[in-house]
Amino acid sequence: MGNGESQLSSVPAQKLGWFIQEYLKPYEECQTLIDEMVNTICDVLQEPEQFPLVQGVAIGGSYGRKTVLRGNSDGTLVLFFSDLKQFQDQKRSQRDILDKTGDKLKFCLFTKWLKNNFEIQKSLDGFTIQVFTKNQRISFEVLAAFNALSLNDNPSPWIYRELKRSLDKTNASPGEFAVCFTELQQKFFDNRPGKLKDLILLIKHWHQQCQKKIKDLPSLSPYALELLTVYAWEQGCRKDNFDIAEGVRTVLELIKCQEKLCIYWMVNYNFEDETIRNILLHQLQSARPVILDPVDPTNNVSGDKICWQWLKKEAQTWLTSPNLDNELPAPSWNVLPAPLFTTPGHLLDKFIKEFLQPNKCFLEQIDSAVNIIRTFLKENCFRQSTAKIQIVRGGSTAKGTALKTGSDADLVVFHNSLKSYTSQKNERHKIVKEIHEQLKAFWREKEEELEVSFEPPKWKAPRVLSFSLKSKVLNESVSFDVLPAFNALGQLSSGSTPSPEVYAGLIDLYKSSDLPGGEFSTCFTVLQRNFIRSRPTKLKDLIRLVKHWYKECERKLKPKGSLPPKYALELLTIYAWEQGSGVPDFDTAEGFRTVLELVTQYQQLCIFWKVNYNFEDETVRKFLLSQLQKTRPVILDPAEPTGDVGGGDRWCWHLLAKEAKEWLSSPCFKDGTGNPIPPWKVPTMQTPGSCGARIHPIVNEMFSSRSHRILNNNSKRNF
């Protein structure tokens, strides 16, 4: 293979794609010949007159998953025999029937003119078939199995219950019957993009090079690394076309975190069935690393810890090699080594600190990026005009709820040419266009220092300019949304509330037009920001946790429907805390559970605040009463009353509620001794006569026993 045998660390990052094509992928003509031979073998094995007991053939291993490396590779041929009627039948020796099958197959293949391209060799358990061309050899292990799926494409919960019963009855090892689900393994990989399989080839080749260094090292299943690579791509990218080097760095970083790795899928099984749920919870609480086979929940394919520890050192070596670490920042995908679902309740604070809280350096980087754009807007963008602007920072970094994984910033530009809500609607696209043109010119002047990538607008008359910024002083790219807006609040002094006239004008416009609620929420960015920024640190951490949960749900549910906005979940979290706790130090698991319980009760939710508007002004009062009579859920934006982020039937709350219900069985809601963690007692509905959100709930009615303990620890605090 020539240069293919050289150290991968010597291959430049930008050449990795070329390296895969040049040295790792099988030659096309060889692959075609191998495919033809394998198809012939499968056809022969399914000839009833020759092999009457064979009900079907499944192809597995690297060949079945289409992750074959050039040269020597592996595969499995799984023969479903009619006399294997249940899982435990596989515990009987299949040596005799496989011997006879191998002998007859050898004779049949000789008559098919394949004698120069295959070898059948006896083994302890049966036989292997080697299929080869000049430059490619695949060694297939032939296995006998019970056809667990029969004619079904998808496994039922019943089949996994039977699997567990059979394992217990026969004292078989977990995963021993995974071969019965070979077709599902193939299906799991079938719909993956070609470039992801290229990345898998690269990781497998690297692993082979590592193994050559220490031959006595316990071997790690290539399947485990394939699944790890799929997980990295699913969690961090999901694009058909991506940068191979970014994928490599991500997989290597995950290998470095092997003592935290916990990976599973719910494509063939989930937590709904009690037996399967118990299997999963047991597996997910096992010692790390855990990588569950997506087709068999009893099969942890992670293997021996020793090989992971050694692989960790090799991963660090490649990561820090000059060719892979050739640019700053060296980009990778943001992927956590373990899902939130598996984290016990008493460790949620640690999870937030390790994986969700941005560090000081991250926040300083965001501030630096914001200062670059803020300076551009103030000093460069409008210098050819008489325009006056005021810039307000919004978004999660301004609120204090930013996540570690994702650098973004919102800048609202109050432009003096926008003198009303209507002028904002009609004229803002011109300001967006001007900022776009001026930023492009600014970038051309600073090309050696800055890199700007613009996102295409979502609307014909754009209301926001979205772009990402890279700089020599930034460790990573920062995404920006710049939004022109009418300064509806004027010079609002700190601590004061807007006059009712501000809202009356907005309400009149909303009622006399077909504009959606919240259309002018950018005008009230300061109020939205202050509403959250002033909250206790631990509450903002709970918001981070809920946002992370939402992102996990969004990744899974987005293809099924439009989910409610993240802001709705932020407000729901604040409401849960106000009504159920109200103290700066509280039990995070209790708070998290309360939010999810409220999500499951979305059809009853009616939530509002009286911090910026209330029922005293007649116009506002009538409008609020009409808003509160809308289809549930109703969650009014505390900054402006036309924004109902609950939205009634507008969004697919039912999808989120179903997910929340499944999550209630998570270890997140068990304490250190395994006892269930209760939610706070929180009403789902407020009425105009209720106390609102500024008065803390009555302690005896609203606090759980665990919260009482926390409250006692904070007895010096005045309520």
UniProtKB/Swiss-Prot annotation:
GO terms for cellular component: cytoplasm; cytosol; intracellular membrane-bounded organelle; membrane; nucleoplasm; perinuclear region of cytoplasm. Pfam families: NTP_transf_2, OAS1_C. Changing Y421 to P/A: Significant loss of activity. This is 2'-5'-oligoadenylate synthase 2. The modification N6-acetyllysine is found at K378. Produced as a latent enzyme which is activated by double stranded RNA (dsRNA) generated during the course of viral infection. The dsRNA activator must be at least 15 nucleotides long, and no modification of the 2'-hydroxyl group is tolerated. ssRNA or dsDNA do not act as activators. Strongly inhibited by copper, iron and zinc ions. Partially inhibited by cobalt and nickel ions. It is found in: Cytoplasm; Cytoplasm, Perinuclear region. Residues 343-683 are annotated as: OAS domain 2. Its cofactor is Mg(2+). Myristoylation is not essential for its activity. Glycosylated. Glycosylation is essential for its activity. Its EC number is 2.7.7.84. Changing D481A: Loss of activity. One of its GO terms (molecular function) is double-stranded RNA binding. Changing K670A: Loss of activity. The lineage of its organism: Eukaryota, Metazoa, Chordata, Craniata, Vertebrata. Homodimer. Induction: By type I interferon (IFN) and viruses. The gene is OAS2.
